[in-house]
Swiss-Prot record:
EC number: 6.3.2.13
Gene3D superfamilies: Mur ligase, C-terminal domain, Mur-like, catalytic domain, MurE/MurF, N-terminal domain
Name of the gene encoding the protein in the UniProt record: murE
Source species: Bacillus anthracis
Ligand binding (UDP-N-acetyl-alpha-D-muramoyl-L-alanyl-D-glutamate): S30, N149, T150, T151, S177, R185
Function: Catalyzes the addition of meso-diaminopimelic acid to the nucleotide precursor UDP-N-acetylmuramoyl-L-alanyl-D-glutamate (UMAG) in the biosynthesis of bacterial cell-wall peptidoglycan.
Record's protein name: UDP-N-acetylmuramoyl-L-alanyl-D-glutamate--2,6-diaminopimelate ligase
Subcellular location: Cytoplasm
Locus of motif Meso-diaminopimelate recognition motif: 407-410
Length: 491
């Protein structure tokens, strides 16, 4: 593709050189540049790849996209924002693949992963070959791939969409992070349905204020309706029980469909009842009301199911098909996942890493707890410090016993992180055990029959980051090991 043809997709008045070389690939990593590449420079938090433009040119880059003039011997296209330009260029270069997909984007603080997995099951049941992009993994049909970020970088994203189309995928569900929205990674993505789960405190290390965080999430809905294909109706599926929804309603040109429990909505749940074996409720839609029994536990999971139901209905899936899927849902790895080693107490691993999600998980556990509730929780290093005392407060408020431990301390001193947490403790029903493995073994050793142990924060993760080192660590494996050890000692 010629350079002039490629950059014609940019509509923010780029400064385009007269030269018109052939572009054979797009790269954002100078180390991957080869003959014919278009190298896009981006200024990150720690590295500014404008500094590697000469290296890219020396490696054969045919042209460079930058935010400032660069002294190189190849054509330079000047743009206002290279992050967003990369997304649009990648979309165009790979044939605008999302135009060929029914694309569903899910954003919010909590519930994205579970909702996306439910939605994927619903679309499969409707006969679609599906793609899935999210926190746990990426799927193309029945193939599964590991991921580094909730939402990949713009280049990887468009390459993935193109691969999905090539493999016959016609419907894709993806989690859309606030970082991806703020950095413009999803510019060029033609969403058909955008889903909002909820907004609570998280990522303030990046966004600085809740107002900025709210704005970033809202970009998905503000951009929805600016369709590349005017024959496709666009839908914003919004949680009517969240106060932010009113603002998102005003910001979108798409058709709004609401769901909720406490506020009158298009799709609702009533008469919710929970046991340790599942949840029952009445699903109310504009068409009919249906009694639902599902294996998933918790009010938060009812919200996830409502979001997926509303998104499924606007995607043309019958209510009957949706109900059949809900009844068989087995849960998502690391989301209220029970670790069963034959013990007489319950061990649950959950990804809850925000105050709101931790509160929801602990409240749910207390609803069917016959004994004490233990909560093992930590907070990530190099991340939002303001939520540390709040997380600690939630743990002591809703658990009988709280154990503060390490999560992914990264470059921070684990003891300093825990000190931040202790400042939020309510009462004295907590203890501090820095080593996460030791903390899990300690709780499992102390638990009595019918107690519940919640191991929060890491969920599906199979690693722990200490300093710059990434160690294998899986809460589920450690818990199973501790359960087995205790059972063997009791024989």
């Amino acid at each position: 593709m010629k350079l002039h043809t490629l950059v014609s997709c940019l509509h923010d008045f780029p400064v385009v050189p007269k030269e018109n070389p052939e572009i054979t690939s797009i790269e954002a990593d100078s180390r991957k540049v080869k003959e014919g590449s278009l190298f896009v420079c981006m200024k990150g938090y720690t590295v500014d790849s404008h500094d590697f433009a000469k290296q890219a040119a020396a490696q054969g880059a045919a042209a460079i996209v930058a935010e400032r003039p660069i002294d190189v011997d190849v054509p330079v296209v000047l743009v206002k924002n290279t992050f967003r330009s990369l997304a649009v260029l990648a979309d165009y270069f790979y044939g605008q693949p999302t135009h060929k997909l029914h694309l569903i984007g899910i954003t919010g603080t909590n519930g994205k992963t579970t909702t996306s997995h439910i939605m994927d099951e619903i679309m499969r049941a409707h006969g679609h070959k599906t793609g899935l992009i999210g926190t746990i993994n990426m799927k193309i049909g029945d193939e599964t791939f590991e991921v580094k970020n909730t939402t990949p970088d713009a280049l990887t994203l468009q390459q993935t969409f193109a691969k999905m189309v090539e493999h016959g995928v016609d419907s894709t569900v993806m989690e859309v992070s606030s970082h991806a929205l703020d950095l413009g990674r999803v510019h060029g993505c033609d969403y058909d349905v955008a889903v909002f789960t909820n907004l609570t405190q998280d990522h303030l290390d990046y966004h600085k204020t809740m107002e900025e965080y709210k704005h970033a999430k809202g970009l998905l809905f503000a951009q929805l309706g600016n369709s590349y294909n005017h024959n496709r109706e666009k839908y914003a599926v919004l949680n009517n029980d969240d106060a932010v929804t009113v603002e998102y309603m005003r910001s979108t040109a798409a058709t709004v469909v609401t769901y909720g429990i406490d506020t009158t909505s298009d799709v609702m749940a009533k008469d919710i009842a929970m046991t340790s074996g599942g949840t029952t409720f009445t699903l109310v839609t504009p068409y009919e009301s249906v009694n639902v029994t599902m294996k998933l536990i918790g009010k938060f999971n009812v919200y996830n199911v409502l979001a997926a139901t509303a998104a499924g209905l606007v995607s043309g899936v019958s209510l009957e098909t949706i109900i059949d899927v809900i009844k068989e849902l087995a849960g998502v790895p690391g989301r209220f996942e029970v670790v069963d080693g034959g013990q007489n107490y319950t061990v649950i691993v959950d990804y809850a890493h925000t105050p709101d999600s931790l509160e929801n998980v602990l409240k749910t556990a207390k609803q069917f707890a016959k004994g004490d509730v233990y909560c093992i929780v930590g907070c990530g290093g190099d991340r939002d410090r303001t939520k540390r005392p709040i997380m600690a407060s939630v743990a002591t408020q809703y658990a009988t016993h709280a154990i503060y431990t390490s999560d992914n301390p990264r470059s921070e001193d684990p003891a300093a992180i825990l000190d931040d947490m202790v400042h939020g403790a309510n009462g004295n029903n907590y203890e501090v055990i820095i080593d996460r493995k030791e903390a899990i073994h300690h709780a499992i050793t102390k638990a009595k029959a019918d107690d519940i142990i919640i191991i929060a924060g890491k969920g599906h993760e199979t690693y722990q980051i200490i300093g710059k080192d990434v160690h294998h660590f899986d809460d589920r494996e450690v818990a199973k090991e501790a359960i087995t050890e205790r059972l063997n000692n009791e024989e």
